[in-house]
């Protein structure tokens, strides 16, 4: 008897992401004709420990990744029960046999892994988030909206990569999200008034990139926008420093705001900012090997969620170091950093067992697929980072969260969040 859940076909397709760069979409189909897909996102600012993408012609195509899906992965997964996520991912890991997924490509592997999960949920007639959550009733995560861009995400002189708002003190996700949109619109007006309408064009993640030079200029703009919109004490602030990108390893200094700072001076810089602004979230404040400095900052900023992205790259090996050193209260969750859904589950489960907040994140190169929104709800992520409330590949995720809240009546995580 044929198992209707058995994988009948795996097929790769070259598509483009939100930056116009090629990426891979993988389709997984069962014997019963049920099919879904997974897209591989791509980051601009990457940790050195991330899974390696397979690309060709200086990154201009992913033809080899498509061939790998069609001629290596397809026969390897033929006949496997699509509900067996762990088995599927282990087969992919074993065939690849490298620590950084460089043989099959992290992009090929994660697209296949996502496609299998989505196909399994579809075959069972379940929403993706319900399939992941099981019997648990999850909450809608708090959004972290990146509304001013700097660093590798912008063409200005700001070194901090993302300036973020967090709408926390609201009863529903819808209330929180639309309040954040008011702040975003207010910010757009301020930028247009002060710097000209040309600077209200948006960057890769939907945020603005005004001609700013120093960190406090960006923070002042956002703080003013929050107050003008009437949400002081309800909407808070955060930053993703992506500090590895402005760290000079030869000098062992951080080049920021026209100064060269040693790690201790940079720590004091962050402490001063936390006194001046309602900053409750700080991601990658030091370069990616500075577990001790992360921990020192977290210890001194107890009410701020210091979070590791490049520090951990969704890899359990590095999370264990961070747990031992008490480096952070938060972790970024990016499935494509490690390469499979199963490894991502291992990472999030370990973080949860150690009372570490989960921050599920998009990448700067995204597609219109809203998988990451469902994934964030399913794992009961505390937060979700998926850009500003602009650009279709960002708003598709927010619209999915609005739909889930409306259809299933899930509670908003911010309602119960205490700083």
Swiss-Prot record:
**Active site per the UniProt annotation:** 205, 334
Keywords of this protein's UniProt record, alphabetized?
Cytoplasm, Glycolysis, Lyase, Magnesium, Metal-binding, Secreted
UniProt keyword Lyase, yes or no? yes
Q: Which family does it belong to?
A: Belongs to the enolase family.
Cellular component aspect of the GO annotation: cell surface; extracellular region; phosphopyruvate hydratase complex
Query: What organism does the UniProt record list as the source?
Result: Saccharolobus islandicus (strain L.S.2.15 / Lassen #1) (Sulfolobus islandicus)
Listed pathway(s): Carbohydrate degradation; glycolysis; pyruvate from D-glyceraldehyde 3-phosphate: step 4/5
Binding-site positions, (2R)-2-phosphoglycerate: 161, 334, 363-364, 385
Where in the cell does this protein reside? Cytoplasm; Secreted; Cell surface
Chain's gene name: eno
Biological process terms from the Gene Ontology for this record are: glycolytic process
What name is this protein filed under?
A: Enolase
Reactions accelerated catalytically: (2R)-2-phosphoglycerate = phosphoenolpyruvate + H2O
The record's annotation in HAMAP family points to: Enolase (MF_00318)
Cofactor names: Mg(2+)
Cofactor stoichiometry and binding remark: Binds a second Mg(2+) ion via substrate during catalysis.
